Regions:
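Intrinsically disordered, low-complexity linker/terminal regions across diverse proteins
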Residues: 81, 274-277, 296-300, 361-364, ...
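N-terminal low-complexity, Pro/Thr/Ser-rich intrinsically disordered segments
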Residues: 24-39, 43
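Bacterial signal peptide processing site
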Residues: 19-21
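C-terminal motif of bacterial Sec signal peptides marking the signal peptidase cleavage site
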Residues: 15-17
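Noncatalytic, helix-rich "gating/capping" subdomain that lines the substrate-entry/channel surface
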Residues: 95-398
Length: 691
């Protein structure tokens, strides 16, 4: 349920991403407008708000903003990330100057320096990977193959919090409370094994997909040739054939998003009986799961098919596959030929980005991602004031109260269901800025001269941390995002929310800004995350995160009718010629957008204490609220990236999320929207999920 990010630029960090005229206008407007927050220079007033509210709010910005050559898209995440990068670079510069020899600062310095030093990486060649490649080459039977596959498993998927279903390893592992075992933490087994983003990239007859497949096959061959692999062309063909079979075994994304589908618990014996082909003892022992007796078979239909492929496909094909993915996953810390080939395919073919980012920026982000708590603690100590934490906590409380009022006012919901919903709202655990406790990095080996080993060690260390939770009580206060990430998340089995520090700044939140701006921007984000607790997935969990039915049949039928109407609404949006948004695939995010926006608006009105909002720069309070929301979704994407989002992501493209205002009655009144305008919906067709 990862929240896609907002986009409201009101700071000088926009200079790096916008052309000079847009930047100068925004800076001047910020100076003149004080702390209003709305960028009127972004607006295209030639567009009627009732025809296209995204273009009305953001049209001039879209026309005048160029996507940087080293980016696949530009938007709120990237603008805010410029500040996050600036702050993190300052932190790292100070740490490295101190030349630390121990503690987390030494880990940060060593990881960063090793990643940055491409001369050393190039000089080392494939020596750091030799042991891994030799082990694959030595495989001669299915037991050894199963062990090798098990040794690659990592905690690199997350179906519940991040809706991340993709891993190059044959299976993904995720550890939390089991969907069918409240109070008991289990390892989830998930489908994996493909290098392209999603199964449709292999199976679609679309000519663009066929072209991508051809380029992927050529990329595989390039990587293997760079490694001196024998018969790289033949191996690439075998890998492509194997991955196509793996993709055919995969469950589609809509099925992956259905939590009820992922609630099957298999014992160790059932796993072996239901999914023959793999030597499960060898695989689980190598994966550190040899003592696990229960598994959440999240992709229960795919697991037997993937296991069968291990039993039926030639060992050589699997050795080819293991070799390629070992190199592909670590290409960024291998010699230049690997780095360049990886960017040419993953960066340019898949995302449309023409230019790679500077190595120091890549090193900074890689270090921040690898040592999340070490960097995060230093980050919040310096850049996140206690006053911001307190103000956001107050906004969260106001949003929760608004959501509760909206639940109480629903006419179609029975008292028993309302009682459960209110109990769930009241029980939400909210984390603002950073976690209550930090990871202990004792035992993690990070050196200053082996970036490949560092990357491997961090992934293994994180995996061992996750599987150590098996059988232990769930911590409802556990964080699933680092503080230095510009994002927010709802955690369904914890009934909890995380709002990292990096999103709680301009352009998302300004402690001195007009209430209309803050509630339209970060307030809608807070409302979105609260509302995820009541989307088609979140509504399956109760106040303590147990998956159980707390709805009456009639109530859920009414709820589903509203959800279906919203799915149909989004099905109509065309992202690229012939490529429409999938309303079912994006439904939970769309529900959270609509319900969260409604709750944020109600909380904003309550914050006025019965007083009228002032008119500022010719804009009423309601107009500023809705413009802040729409400007939070300002975005410009390369076509390749937009296609990938539509096909693989649970979020609709931002330009369509901005149009969610059409379901809010107050928006019609604020902008005089009339029948006949393109976004107009008759009152009985406006989706009213949760109020």
């Amino acid at each position: 349920m990862k929240r896609a990010l907002l986009f409201v630029v009101a700071s000088s960090f926009a200079l790096a991403a916008c052309n000079s005229s847009t930047s100068q206008n925004a800076a001047q407007e910020q100076k003149q407008g004080g702390d209003v927050g709305i960028q009127t220079s972004w607006m295209d007033k030639s567009v009627k708000p009732g025809d296209d509210f995204f273009s009305y709010a953001d049209g001039s910005w879209v026309k005048n903003t160029a996507i940087p050559a080293d980016r696949s898209r530009i938007g709120g995440f990237f603008i805010a990330d410029l500040e996050r990068e600036k702050n993190t670079k300052e932190l790292f510069d100070n740490i490295i100057k101190a030349n630390p020899t121990s503690g987390t600062d030494a880990l940060i310095a060593n990881y960063y320096n090793a990643y940055l030093n491409t001369d050393a990486i190039d000089k080392a060649g494939l020596a750091p990977a030799k042991a891994d490649l030799d082990a694959i080459n030595a495989i001669t039977n299915k037991q050894q193959l199963s062990s090798a596959i098990g040794g690659t498993l990592r905690s690199d998927t997350d179906p519940l919090n991040a809706t991340n279903f993709q891993t190059e390893n044959l299976f993904g592992v995720f550890v939390t409370q089991g969907l069918a075992t409240p109070g008991e933490q289990l390892p989830y087994l998930m489908q994996g094994g493909i290098g392209l983003p999603e199964r449709d990239y292999y199976l679609s007859s679309d000519p663009k997909m066929a072209d991508t497949r051809n380029k992927y096959k050529a990329y595989i061959q390039t990587i293997l040739q760079a490694a001196g692999y024998p018969d790289a062309q033949g191996a690439a063909a075998r890998i492509m054939a194997l991955e196509t079979k793996i993709a055919q075994a995969h469950e589609p994304i809509e099925q992956s998003q259905d939590f009820k589908n992922g609630a099957q618990v298999w014992t160790r014996q059932q796993l072996e009986q239901k999914a023959p082909g793999i030597d499960w003892t060898a695989l689980l022992n190598a994966a550190g799961l040899g003592s696990a007796q229960k598994f959440d078979a999240y992709h229960f239909a795919a697991i037997p098919k993937l296991s069968a492929l291990v039993g039926s496909e030639p060992i050589q094909s699997w050795k080819d596959w293991l070799t390629f993915h070992t190199l592909n996953q670590r290409a960024n810390v291998l010699p230049k030929a690997f780095r360049d080939a990886s960017f040419a395919f993953n960066g340019t073919v898949l995302a449309g980005t023409p230019q790679q980012r500077p190595r120091d920026a890549l090193a900074l982000n890689a270090t921040s991602g690898a040592l999340q708590d070490a960097v995060g603690k230093a980050y919040v100590d310096k850049y996140f004031p206690a006053s911001s934490k307190a103000q956001i906590q107050t906004m969260v409380d106001n949003l929760k109260a608004a959501f509760a009022r909206r639940v109480q006012a629903i006419g179609w919901m029975s008292p028993s269901t309302k009682q459960e919903a209110l109990k769930k709202v009241q029980g939400i655990v909210v984390g603002v800025g950073y976690p209550d406790s930090w990871r202990d990095y004792a035992g993690l080996q990070i050196v200053g001269d082996n970036a490949y080993a560092n990357q491997k060690n961090v992934a293994l260390w994180e995996y061992r941390h996750q599987i150590a939770k098996i059988g232990k009580p769930m911590d409802r206060h556990e964080w699933w995002m680092p503080p230095q990430l510009v994002n927010a998340v709802n955690l369904p089995v914890q009934n909890a929310l995380n709002f990292p520090a990096a999103i709680l700044v301009n352009p998302f939140f300004d402690p001195n800004a007009d209430a209309a701006f803050n509630y339209g921007a970060i307030g809608a984000t807070i409302g979105h995350e609260i509302s995820h607790s009541f989307d088609t997935g979140g509504a399956l969990f109760d106040a303590v995160g147990a998956m159980r039915n707390w709805w009456t049949p009639a109530d859920f039928k009414n709820f589903q009718a509203q959800a279906d109407a919203l799915a149909n609404q989004f099905d109509q949006y065309e992202a690229l010629p012939g490529l429409h948004v999938n309303g079912k695939q994006t439904l939970n995010e769309n529900i959270a957008d609509v319900a969260g926006l409604g709750a944020a608006y109600e909380a904003y009105k309550a914050s006025l204490g019965g007083k009228p909002a002032p008119v500022i720069n010719g804009l009423t309070g309601d107009q500023r609220f809705f413009l802040a929301y729409a400007q939070s979704w300002a975005v410009k994407s390369r076509p390749e990236t937009l296609r990938r989002i539509v096909l693989t992501n649970e979020h609709a493209p931002e330009q369509f999320r901005a149009q969610s205002v059409r379901n809010i009655d107050a928006w019609y009144q604020a902008f005089g929207v009339q029948p006949g305008q393109k976004l107009y919906l008759a009152p009985d067709r406006r989706v009213k999920i949760w109020g």
